[in-house]
Protein backbone atom coordinates (compact mmCIF):
# COMPACT_ATOMS: atom_id res chain seq x y z
CA UNK A 1 0.00 0.00 0.00
CA UNK A 2 1.19 3.58 -0.56
CA UNK A 3 2.47 5.67 2.35
CA UNK A 4 2.21 9.46 2.21
CA UNK A 5 4.88 11.45 4.08
CA UNK A 6 4.40 15.06 5.17
CA UNK A 7 7.33 17.26 6.18
CA UNK A 8 7.81 19.95 8.85
CA UNK A 9 10.85 22.10 9.59
CA UNK A 10 11.84 22.42 13.27
CA UNK A 11 13.46 25.51 14.79
CA UNK A 12 15.96 23.60 16.95
CA UNK A 13 17.43 20.14 17.33
CA UNK A 14 15.55 17.88 19.74
CA UNK A 15 16.71 15.14 22.10
CA UNK A 16 13.67 12.92 21.96
CA UNK A 17 14.95 10.24 24.30
CA UNK A 18 14.39 12.60 27.24
CA UNK A 19 10.67 12.98 26.61
CA UNK A 20 9.40 9.60 25.47
CA UNK A 21 8.17 8.59 28.94
CA UNK A 22 5.87 11.64 28.99
CA UNK A 23 4.62 10.88 25.50
CA UNK A 24 3.84 7.30 26.53
CA UNK A 25 1.68 8.61 29.35
CA UNK A 26 -0.06 11.11 27.11
CA UNK A 27 -0.93 8.54 24.44
CA UNK A 28 -1.46 5.65 26.85
CA UNK A 29 0.64 3.34 24.70
CA UNK A 30 4.28 2.41 24.13
CA UNK A 31 6.23 4.57 21.70
CA UNK A 32 9.06 2.68 20.02
CA UNK A 33 12.07 4.99 19.54
CA UNK A 34 15.16 4.11 17.48
CA UNK A 35 18.18 6.43 17.48
CA UNK A 36 21.02 6.28 14.94
CA UNK A 37 23.98 8.41 13.99
CA UNK A 38 24.29 8.16 10.22
CA UNK A 39 26.66 9.51 7.60
CA UNK A 40 25.40 10.55 4.18
CA UNK A 41 28.36 11.77 2.08
CA UNK A 42 27.55 14.72 -0.16
CA UNK A 43 30.80 14.10 -2.04
CA UNK A 44 30.97 10.81 -3.99
CA UNK A 45 34.66 10.55 -3.14
CA UNK A 46 34.11 10.67 0.63
CA UNK A 47 32.37 12.41 3.51
CA UNK A 48 33.14 15.05 6.12
CA UNK A 49 31.91 15.71 9.64
CA UNK A 50 29.25 17.96 8.12
CA UNK A 51 27.72 14.86 6.53
CA UNK A 52 26.94 13.28 9.91
CA UNK A 53 23.33 13.32 11.09
CA UNK A 54 21.25 12.04 13.98
CA UNK A 55 18.17 10.11 12.92
CA UNK A 56 15.24 9.37 15.22
CA UNK A 57 12.53 6.93 14.15
CA UNK A 58 9.44 6.94 16.33
CA UNK A 59 6.71 4.34 15.91
CA UNK A 60 3.46 4.13 17.82
CA UNK A 61 2.70 0.68 19.21
CA UNK A 62 -0.46 -0.23 17.34
CA UNK A 63 -0.67 -3.92 18.26
CA UNK A 64 -4.10 -3.38 19.82
CA UNK A 65 -5.42 -1.19 17.04
CA UNK A 66 -6.89 -1.98 13.64
CA UNK A 67 -4.42 -3.41 11.14
CA UNK A 68 -5.11 -0.50 8.80
CA UNK A 69 -4.00 2.01 11.44
CA UNK A 70 -0.34 2.91 11.63
CA UNK A 71 1.90 5.85 12.46
CA UNK A 72 5.60 6.61 12.06
CA UNK A 73 7.68 9.75 12.60
CA UNK A 74 11.23 10.24 11.31
CA UNK A 75 13.45 13.12 12.49
CA UNK A 76 16.79 14.09 10.94
CA UNK A 77 19.13 16.56 12.61
CA UNK A 78 22.52 18.15 12.07
CA UNK A 79 23.60 20.65 14.75
CA UNK A 80 26.01 22.37 12.34
CA UNK A 81 23.19 23.56 10.08
CA UNK A 82 21.27 26.81 10.50
CA UNK A 83 17.99 24.89 10.39
CA UNK A 84 19.14 21.92 12.47
CA UNK A 85 16.24 19.47 12.18
CA UNK A 86 13.04 18.48 10.42
CA UNK A 87 10.50 15.73 10.87
CA UNK A 88 8.34 13.75 8.51
CA UNK A 89 5.48 11.46 9.34
CA UNK A 90 3.06 9.08 7.72
CA UNK A 91 0.07 7.21 9.00
CA UNK A 92 -3.65 7.07 9.48
CA UNK A 93 -3.61 7.20 13.28
CA UNK A 94 -5.49 10.22 14.65
CA UNK A 95 -2.80 10.51 17.34
CA UNK A 96 -0.44 12.11 14.82
CA UNK A 97 -1.76 15.59 15.54
CA UNK A 98 -1.51 14.92 19.28
CA UNK A 99 2.17 14.04 18.85
CA UNK A 100 2.85 17.21 16.86
CA UNK A 101 1.17 19.43 19.45
CA UNK A 102 3.07 17.64 22.23
CA UNK A 103 6.41 18.29 20.50
CA UNK A 104 5.64 22.01 20.29
CA UNK A 105 4.60 22.24 23.94
CA UNK A 106 7.29 19.97 25.40
CA UNK A 107 10.27 21.42 23.52
CA UNK A 108 9.07 24.94 22.77
CA UNK A 109 9.79 24.67 19.05
CA UNK A 110 8.33 26.32 15.99
CA UNK A 111 7.32 24.05 13.11
CA UNK A 112 6.43 24.94 9.56
CA UNK A 113 5.42 22.93 6.47
CA UNK A 114 8.15 22.21 3.95
CA UNK A 115 7.48 22.81 0.27
CA UNK A 116 9.90 21.44 -2.32
CA UNK A 117 11.15 23.56 -5.20
CA UNK A 118 11.66 22.06 -8.65
CA UNK A 119 15.40 21.55 -8.22
CA UNK A 120 14.85 19.83 -4.89
CA UNK A 121 12.28 17.48 -6.44
CA UNK A 122 14.87 16.34 -8.98
CA UNK A 123 17.44 15.85 -6.21
CA UNK A 124 14.89 13.78 -4.30
CA UNK A 125 14.37 11.59 -7.37
CA UNK A 126 18.11 10.95 -7.49
CA UNK A 127 18.18 10.20 -3.77
CA UNK A 128 15.27 7.76 -4.08
CA UNK A 129 17.10 5.34 -6.36
CA UNK A 130 18.50 2.31 -4.57
CA UNK A 131 22.03 2.93 -3.30
CA UNK A 132 23.41 4.95 -6.21
CA UNK A 133 27.20 5.13 -6.02
CA UNK A 134 29.94 5.63 -8.58
CA UNK A 135 30.80 1.95 -8.33
CA UNK A 136 27.39 0.29 -8.70
CA UNK A 137 25.48 2.42 -11.19
CA UNK A 138 25.23 -0.56 -13.57
CA UNK A 139 23.58 -2.73 -10.89
CA UNK A 140 20.92 -0.37 -9.53
CA UNK A 141 17.19 -0.71 -10.11
CA UNK A 142 15.71 1.77 -12.58
CA UNK A 143 12.11 2.89 -12.87
CA UNK A 144 9.92 4.25 -15.63
CA UNK A 145 9.65 7.94 -14.79
CA UNK A 146 7.05 10.60 -15.43
CA UNK A 147 7.33 14.34 -14.79
CA UNK A 148 4.04 16.24 -14.44
CA UNK A 149 3.71 19.99 -15.04
CA UNK A 150 0.68 22.15 -14.30
CA UNK A 151 0.83 25.72 -15.64
CA UNK A 152 -1.26 28.38 -13.92
CA UNK A 153 -2.77 30.79 -16.43
CA UNK A 154 -5.36 33.48 -15.83
CA UNK A 155 -8.00 31.85 -18.04
CA UNK A 156 -6.86 28.26 -17.38
CA UNK A 157 -6.16 27.74 -21.06
CA UNK A 158 -3.22 25.45 -20.36
CA UNK A 159 -3.72 22.20 -18.54
CA UNK A 160 -1.46 19.59 -17.06
CA UNK A 161 1.09 17.96 -19.34
CA UNK A 162 3.74 15.35 -18.71
CA UNK A 163 6.98 13.85 -19.98
CA UNK A 164 7.47 10.10 -19.68
CA UNK A 165 10.85 8.39 -19.76
CA UNK A 166 10.82 4.58 -20.04
CA UNK A 167 12.90 2.58 -17.59
CA UNK A 168 15.33 1.49 -20.31
CA UNK A 169 15.85 5.10 -21.38
CA UNK A 170 16.55 6.24 -17.81
CA UNK A 171 19.18 3.54 -17.50
CA UNK A 172 20.69 4.24 -20.92
CA UNK A 173 20.92 8.00 -20.36
CA UNK A 174 22.54 7.55 -16.96
CA UNK A 175 25.07 4.99 -18.17
CA UNK A 176 25.80 7.12 -21.22
CA UNK A 177 26.68 10.06 -18.98
CA UNK A 178 29.25 8.03 -17.05
CA UNK A 179 29.50 7.30 -13.36
CA UNK A 180 27.16 9.69 -11.57
CA UNK A 181 25.32 9.63 -8.26
CA UNK A 182 22.75 12.03 -9.74
CA UNK A 183 21.37 10.47 -12.94
CA UNK A 184 18.23 12.62 -13.09
CA UNK A 185 20.02 15.90 -12.46
CA UNK A 186 23.14 15.13 -14.52
CA UNK A 187 21.75 13.11 -17.43
CA UNK A 188 17.97 12.85 -17.73
CA UNK A 189 16.92 16.47 -17.12
CA UNK A 190 19.69 17.88 -19.39
CA UNK A 191 18.58 15.43 -22.10
CA UNK A 192 15.02 16.75 -21.87
CA UNK A 193 16.35 20.29 -22.31
CA UNK A 194 18.62 19.39 -25.23
CA UNK A 195 15.85 17.56 -27.10
CA UNK A 196 12.87 19.82 -26.33
CA UNK A 197 14.22 23.14 -25.06
CA UNK A 198 12.21 22.62 -21.85
CA UNK A 199 14.12 23.69 -18.73
CA UNK A 200 12.53 21.48 -16.08
CA UNK A 201 13.73 23.59 -13.15
CA UNK A 202 11.93 26.64 -14.61
CA UNK A 203 8.65 24.89 -15.37
CA UNK A 204 5.73 24.38 -12.94
CA UNK A 205 6.78 20.86 -11.96
CA UNK A 206 4.11 19.34 -9.70
CA UNK A 207 5.27 15.74 -9.34
CA UNK A 208 7.95 13.24 -10.28
CA UNK A 209 6.85 9.61 -10.39
CA UNK A 210 9.19 6.62 -10.30
CA UNK A 211 6.67 3.95 -11.27
CA UNK A 212 5.84 1.51 -8.48
CA UNK A 213 8.39 3.09 -6.16
CA UNK A 214 8.07 6.78 -5.27
CA UNK A 215 5.98 9.84 -6.08
CA UNK A 216 7.53 13.20 -5.22
CA UNK A 217 5.17 16.16 -4.96
CA UNK A 218 5.59 19.78 -3.86
CA UNK A 219 4.47 19.13 -0.27
CA UNK A 220 4.70 15.37 0.22
CA UNK A 221 6.35 12.12 -0.87
CA UNK A 222 4.50 8.85 -1.44
CA UNK A 223 6.48 5.63 -1.06
CA UNK A 224 5.70 1.96 -1.63
CA UNK A 225 7.28 1.02 1.71
CA UNK A 226 6.89 2.56 5.17
CA UNK A 227 10.34 4.11 5.19
CA UNK A 228 12.50 6.83 3.64
CA UNK A 229 16.13 6.45 2.60
CA UNK A 230 18.78 8.35 4.53
CA UNK A 231 19.89 10.11 1.35
CA UNK A 232 16.33 11.39 0.79
CA UNK A 233 16.20 12.71 4.35
CA UNK A 234 19.56 14.48 3.92
CA UNK A 235 18.37 16.19 0.73
CA UNK A 236 15.28 17.47 2.55
CA UNK A 237 17.30 18.92 5.44
CA UNK A 238 19.78 20.56 3.06
CA UNK A 239 16.93 22.07 1.03
CA UNK A 240 15.43 24.03 3.95
CA UNK A 241 18.59 25.89 4.90
CA UNK A 242 18.37 29.67 4.70
CA UNK A 243 20.28 31.27 1.84
CA UNK A 244 21.71 34.79 1.98
CA UNK A 245 20.55 37.17 -0.71
From Swiss-Prot:
Gene Ontology CC annotations of this record: kinetochore; nucleus; outer kinetochore
Sorted UniProt keywords: Cell cycle, Cell division, Centromere, Chromosome, Kinetochore, Meiosis, Mitosis, Nucleus
Main location group: nucleus
A Gene Ontology BP annotation from the UniProt entry: cell division
Subcellular location: Nucleus; Chromosome, Centromere, Kinetochore
Function text: Component of the kinetochore, a multiprotein complex that assembles on centromeric DNA and attaches chromosomes to spindle microtubules, mediating chromosome segregation and sister chromatid segregation during meiosis and mitosis. Component of the inner kinetochore constitutive centromere-associated network (CCAN), which serves as a structural platform for outer kinetochore assembly.
Family: Belongs to the CENP-L/IML3 family.
Misc remark: Present with 125 molecules/cell in log phase SD medium.
Subunit text: Forms a heterodimer with IML3. CHL4-IML3 is part of a larger constitutive centromere-associated network (CCAN) (also known as central kinetochore CTF19 complex in yeast), which is composed of at least AME1, CHL4, CNN1, CTF3, CTF19, IML3, MCM16, MCM21, MCM22, MHF1, MHF2, MIF2, NKP1, NKP2, OKP1 and WIP1. Interacts with CHL4 and CTF19.
Protein name: Inner kinetochore subunit IML3
